[in-house]
Amino acid sequence: MDRLKEIAKNLDSKDELSIYRDKFVLPKNQIYLDGNSLGVLAKDVVDNVNYTIKEEWGNNLISSWNKSWIQLPRIISRKIADIIKSNEDEVYVGSSTSINLFKLLKSILEANRDIKNITTDSLNFPSDKYICEVIAKDFKIDFKFLDYGNDLKPDIEKLKEYISERKGIVVLSHVSFKSSFRYSVEDISKFCKDNNIIVIWDLSHSVGAIDIDMRSNG
């Protein structure tokens, strides 16, 4: 055990990301690995939130809308576009992932009444699955759930065969929240395009963590 600790300490000392540790509030003697549900608090956030509450809200009141707040969606959209390598006008900032997925599915189905089903798989995030089910029920179309029989990795060929037989909308998470399995956006998006299938990617567990190029892969 002592040898393993020494190996771990040695690897930590060479880790290029170790310089970022001091930028976060970390409880003493705790190893925290949950970054997708609630990540650790960045120290800068405390100062920024305090400034927003005390200065922008407390002192500037309604004038803060014109000074900075009203432009925030565009500013943040521009930053996200840089991270995922997409055009700025393709990024929308507002509401939660679930609400946005609901609105997106509803808009697609209202514009394409010939779509008869929505498909997702067992590696997708539960709330995405619930949204797909509800929308399918509202539009009186079929909800299809592909279960791989494990929580680790999908059977890509099985997925392709499944959605090609049930052409409609498929909703997938780019990175699985349980196993961190990473789907090939390029491969599956091309397959869907070639087979006249609409694919929606949830990037919640990948954006900012891994390199994403939606301009090339979309």
Roles of regions detected by a PLM:
Residues 1-218:
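Pyridoxal 5′-phosphate
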